[in-house]
Amino acid sequence: MAHKIRVGVLISGGGTNLQAIIDAYRSNRIDARVVFVGSDNPEAYGLKRAQKHGIPTFAVDYQAIIKETRGRPLEDLVPEGFDLETVLAKQRVSPLSSDRTKVEQYFRSRAIAEAVLLKEMEAYPFDLLVLAGFMRILTPYFIDRVNTDPSQPRIMNIHPSLLPSFPGQDGYCDTYRYGCKVGGCTVHFVDYGEDTGRIIGQKAFEITPDDTIDTVREKGLKLEWQLYPECIQLFAEGRLRMEKPS
């Protein structure tokens, strides 16, 4: 095997995709190793999965941080280098509110949490950051501090639909309810929007009249566990770079 890239993983829940990645590198199917697992949820079972394999873990309790900052003036609490106008100009998430004050509060509070997350990650140098069921939208403040080379994005996400169809939290459910005959999953680079980054890989499955939401999810998850390691391997081989349109 070639030189193994260092992969950091962020999760929010059970960590089944994390387990698939761990299994892939422990069986030498990918040129990678997981150097840390972090979560916004201190109770995430995926942290225990990582600990069983001796992988360092940490948790940044987003919910507690956001609750603590709610209703407080945050101008003096935001991290050094945070520029609200720059963040607002770059972000392409759907409008969070028509209330400018609430929008500003949202991005300031997330930057405060992200600064804590970045500080935790400093202890574990990494080449690629993988979101494996991390249920927080990353702001430009965070993304720009990980993606320091415009030609080489370093944050991957996996999404439960064939993007660009059905972005958002529950892609399998949306796919099923829309009546699609084909479902699937997508691995993409993370950009300033929600599930709008460059697509790296996709896998599809048939949806039959006998399928339910649960069986659709089951089919999708099995493909996710194949697709994510494959896309990490493409990154490890240096085959993923961003090129400007000619």
Question: Could you say what each language-model-derived stretch is?
Answer:
Residues 1-246:
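One-carbon transfer enzymes
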